[in-house]
């Protein structure tokens, strides 16, 4: 295919047009007074959302060069979302600001490489200062505040803080759709381990790329399944019950995996295969934990058991299993409460006698998975459109809250980024590196400007007053008041803020140092039917 190539200023200008289109679409959602964006869906009702990464992923531009710029900013939002779970709109606003200011200087003759070094040094200084001013998060009230700010709902903040209190900060918290109109919290027994499906063709929800199994049987073995004949008698038994099957094995490969996938695609039966968690002796112990939780038996040669002789009686059972590409969650295993209690007691006694810190950590993990639960926030709403929007907000809030517990909090509303300006300005740089530093200094103000603008205030006036206010004081865009941000509960996780800045600086620097862009040439349109011919006349040509 022929390629279209642009160089230097033309290349950068085309990409920046794409950056601006995406950023201008996303940044209207920033802050407590941010607006919504309506996304058209091929099927069903439109999605109304203020979630930055969801909007960014939907944008595809007709011009190939502009689309590349937009996709780079979308990557900033996605990366920030993957690392911190929130802050995607802030990252987009920062990227646009750095690119805009940087392009002015590059066009004026500054060296892009020098500017890039200055941006990197300024970003590092800002991140160090953010970590230095961060305050740890502890207590139910502080956790509720973080979640409430992210979700814009005090009620959601209460649900998330209660969920984290009941299953622990690292516990499993999932978000589901409620059948009613009210949002509620439910804690159920469950276990999670870090192994995902072996084939993406096993998913049941193509949008979320997850496999949901309702009331499944669970085959647990430490053997490798390569020959489908080994488990064929068992599969035939399961097929008669019309229930789904989860296979937890050392591995599923050879002819077995494609055979299972083919039957899944054909709709013969619903099956998902995952690798067993852990390694060596720890794997055997974890498989035994799963077997006790689900009321099954581990098919292992250690017990003289063979896969080809296994019956349905050896399978575990659960109310629900959810598998994504990275993890598996087993909810409401069918194991007896007495057997689970005995297993918990055994692990506790091992904890008391172990001297290895590593072993202690792994035993505590197993204990939490076996004795802990899964908190489920059931989201209710009047319409499907409102339900989807609320689910996205709660997911963001949960991620932001975990990030806050992990690295601490700073003043919210973009205030923390303005607070670190003095530290960045103190960097002694010269030439184009100093220009790069100044670009970051201007960009650090941009989130506050945008939050103020979205709330109907003049951003420059707010910035000037903020710079002359005591540290910690900021602008509450929801009320128009100047308050102590942390005391008022307007806070951001430092992980979210620093990730947004780091990712924005990284991609913006790449755009500024771009010297050529290569894109596919648009394919010519198919020739139209010759004019003047009556389509009805074509009948005689057949």
Curated annotation (Swiss-Prot):
- Fetch the InterPro entries from UniProt: Chaperonin_Cpn60_CS (IPR018370), Cpn60/GroEL (IPR001844), Cpn60/GroEL/TCP-1 (IPR002423), GroEL-like_apical_dom_sf (IPR027409), GROEL-like_equatorial_sf (IPR027413), TCP-1-like_intermed_sf (IPR027410)
* Any GO molecular function: ATP binding
Pfam families xrefs: Cpn60_TCP1
Q: Which reaction equation describes what this protein catalyses?
A: ATP + H2O + a folded polypeptide = ADP + phosphate + an unfolded polypeptide
What GO biological process terms does the UniProt entry carry, in alphabetical order? Answer: protein refolding
What's the superkingdom here? Bacteria
**Spans annotated as Disordered:** 523-542
Give the UniProt subcellular location, in the record's own words: Cytoplasm
Instruction: Return the Low complexity bias intervals.
Output: 526-542
Keyword Membrane on this protein? no
Its EC top class is isomerase
Q: E.C. number, please?
A: 5.6.1.7
Q: Which UniProt keywords apply?
A: ATP-binding, Chaperone, Cytoplasm, Isomerase, Nucleotide-binding
Q: What is its main location?
A: cytoplasm
Protein residues bound to ATP: 29-32, 86-90, 413, 476-478, 492
The record's HAMAP family line, in alphabetical order, gives: CH60
Q: Which family does it belong to?
A: Belongs to the chaperonin (HSP60) family.
Function of the protein: Together with its co-chaperonin GroES, plays an essential role in assisting protein folding. The GroEL-GroES system forms a nano-cage that allows encapsulation of the non-native substrate proteins and provides a physical environment optimized to promote and accelerate protein folding.
Q: What is this protein called?
A: Chaperonin GroEL
Upper lineage is:
Bacteria, Bacillati, Bacillota, Bacilli, Lactobacillales
């Amino acid at each position: 295919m022929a390629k279209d190539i642009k160089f230097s200023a033309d290349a950068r200008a085309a990409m920046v047009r794409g950056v601006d289109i995406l950023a201008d679409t996303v940044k209207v959602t920033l802050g407590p007074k941010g607006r919504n964006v309506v996304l058209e869906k091929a099927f069903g009702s439109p999605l109304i959302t203020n979630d930055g990464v969801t909007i960014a992923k939907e944008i595809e531009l007709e011009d190939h060069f502009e689309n590349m710029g937009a996709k780079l900013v979308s990557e900033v939002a996605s990366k920030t979302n993957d690392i911190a779970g929130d802050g995607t709109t802030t990252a987009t606003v920062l990227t646009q600001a750095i690119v805009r200011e940087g392009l002015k200087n590059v066009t004026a003759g500054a060296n892009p490489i020098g500017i890039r070094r200055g941006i990197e040094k300024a970003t590092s200084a800002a991140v160090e200062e953010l970590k230095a001013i961060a305050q740890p998060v502890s207590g139910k009230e502080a956790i509720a505040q973080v979640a409430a700010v992210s979700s814009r709902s005090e009620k959601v903040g209460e649900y998330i803080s209660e969920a984290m209190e009941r299953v622990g900060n690292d516990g499993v918290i999932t978000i589901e759709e409620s059948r009613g109109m009210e949002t509620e919290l439910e804690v159920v027994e469950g276990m999670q381990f870090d192994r995902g499906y072996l084939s993406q063709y096993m998913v049941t929800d193509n949008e979320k790329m997850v496999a949901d199994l309702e009331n499944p049987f669970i085959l647990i073995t430490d053997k490798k399944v390569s020959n489908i004949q080994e488990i064929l008698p068992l599969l035939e038994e399961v097929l008669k019950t019309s229930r789904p099957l989860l296979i937890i094995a050392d591995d599923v490969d050879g002819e077995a995996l494609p055979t299972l996938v083919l039957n899944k695609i054909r709709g013969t039966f619903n099956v998902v295969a995952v690798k067993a968690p852990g390694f060596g002796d720890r794997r055997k112990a974890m498989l035994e934990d799963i077997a006790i939780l689900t009321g099954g038996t581990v098919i292992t040669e250690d017990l003289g058991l063979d896969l080809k002789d296994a019956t349905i009686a050896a399978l575990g059972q659960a109310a629900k299993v959810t598998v994504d590409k990275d993890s598996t969650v087993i909810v409401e295993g069918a194991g007896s409460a007495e057997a689970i209690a005995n297993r918990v007691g055994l692990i506790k006694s091992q904890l008391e006698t172990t001297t290895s810190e590593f072993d202690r950590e792994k035993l505590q993990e197993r204990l939490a998975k076996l004795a802990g639960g899964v908190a489920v926030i059931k989201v209710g709403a009047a319409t499907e459109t409102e339900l989807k929007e609320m689910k996205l907000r709660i997911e963001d809030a949960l991620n932001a809250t975990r990030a806050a517990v992990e690295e601490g909090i700073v003043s919210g509303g973009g205030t923390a980024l303005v607070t670190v300006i003095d530290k960045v300005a103190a960097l002694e740089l010269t030439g184009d590196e100093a220009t790069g530093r100044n670009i970051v200094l201007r960009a650090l103000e941009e989130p506050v400007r945008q939050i103020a603008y979205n709330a109907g205030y003049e951003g420059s006036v707010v910035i000037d007053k903020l710079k002359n206010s005591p540290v910690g004081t900021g602008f509450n865009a929801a009320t128009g008041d100047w308050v102590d941000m942390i005391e008022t509960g307007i806070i951001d996780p430092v992980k979210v803020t620093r990730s947004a800045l780091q990712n924005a600086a990284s991609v913006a620097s790449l755009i500024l140092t771009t010297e050529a862009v290569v894109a596919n040439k648009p394919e010519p349109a198919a020739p139209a039917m010759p004019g003047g011919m009556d389509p009805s006349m074509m009948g005689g040509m057949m």
